[in-house]
Amino acid sequence: MTDVQPYLEKIVERVSVPAIQTSLKGFSKSLLFRFTDTGEEYLIRFVDGKEAVLSHETLAKPDLTVITSSDTLAGVMDKKINGMTAYMQRKIQTKGAIEDLMKLQKLML
């Protein structure tokens, strides 16, 4: 089990990068991370692609959901695990519009 908060904070920080803001222009969605090994849920709300807010809460109907273990998220973000391989092996599962999920790929990889 890995403490995911620093990794999620890193995702939020990356939203301030100008190139990422350009690719997220107008993006206002909610992204729920559900961790299978800890049972924890974290919510990131994106505001117009310019800002992201992290909170330790759940949302009944988020726009996007990522379901994974804390170790898998840490491995992907530390580049010890290939994100696409983890997805193909179903270590990372997603719910939501594929176009929106693809936009967020840059934040995790």
Located regions from the model:
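Feature captures hydrophobic
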Residues: M1-L109
